[in-house]
């Protein structure tokens, strides 16, 4: 890798470290930055998170400069900046079913969400169907407060 490439990588890593929230409960702050094409003459298709439309959208990157809201694929953008769908399941009654510890949805694999149960957080499979009645459930980190009612 050339020294210019290493400097660019170092710059992006420094920017990422500065813009990542300390709490880990929200998407990285760079997700709210506008699309920035950069200073070179290239025309590389990339994706950025548009905080106004709340979607990952395509733009053309020049190949140098720009900011960290710049992803090679729409999936990378979505995984980094969009909250995962679904809600956390009710707290498991049985012991031994604990999932991986997490800080936010983005630290959980696949469609799992980061759920808080009595002060501990763990990755759990998201629930997508409507509840038959109003139920008190734990919540995904960064969305509705724990213990809030989930309406039908």
Curated annotation (Swiss-Prot):
The keyword Cell wall biogenesis/degradation does not apply. It comes from the Eukaryota. Disulfide bonds join 31-81, 40-64, 56-77, 88-115, 102-114, 108-123. SUPFAM superfamilies: BPTI-like, Elafin-like. The record marks 41-42 as: Reactive bond for trypsin. It is found in: Secreted. Expressed by the venom gland. The keyword Cell membrane does not apply. InterPro entries: Elafin-like_sf, Kunitz_BPTI, Kunitz_BPTI_sf, Prtase_inh_Kunz-CS, TFPI/VKTCI-like, WAP_dom. Keywords: Disulfide bond, Protease inhibitor, Pyrrolidone carboxylic acid, Secreted, Serine protease inhibitor, Signal. GO terms for cellular component: extracellular space. Pfam families: Kunitz_BPTI, WAP. May code either for a precursor which is processed to form two individual classes of venom proteins (Kunitz/BPTI and waprin) or a novel toxin with two distinct domains and having a new biological function. Belongs to the venom Kunitz-type family. This is Fused toxin protein. It comes from Sistrurus catenatus edwardsii.
């Amino acid at each position: 890798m050339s020294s210019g490439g290493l400097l660019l990588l170092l710059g992006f890593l420094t920017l990422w470290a500065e813009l990542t929230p300390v709490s880990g409960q929200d998407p990285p702050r760079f997700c709210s930055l506008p699309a920035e094409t950069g200073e070179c003459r290239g025309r590389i298709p990339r994706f950025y998170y548009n905080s106004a439309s709340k979607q990952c959208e395509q733009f053309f990157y020049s190949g140098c400069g720009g900011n960290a809201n710049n992803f090679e694929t729409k999936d990378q953008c979505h995984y980094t900046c969009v909250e995962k769908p679904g809600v956390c399941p009710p707290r498991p009654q049985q012991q031994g079913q604990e999932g991986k510890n997490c800080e936010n949805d983005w630290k959980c694999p696949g469609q799992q969400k980061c759920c808080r149960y009595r002060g501990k957080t763990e990755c759990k499979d998201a629930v997508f169907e409507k509840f038959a009645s109003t139920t008190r459930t734990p919540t995904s980190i960064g969305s509705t407060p724990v213990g809030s009612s989930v309406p039908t």
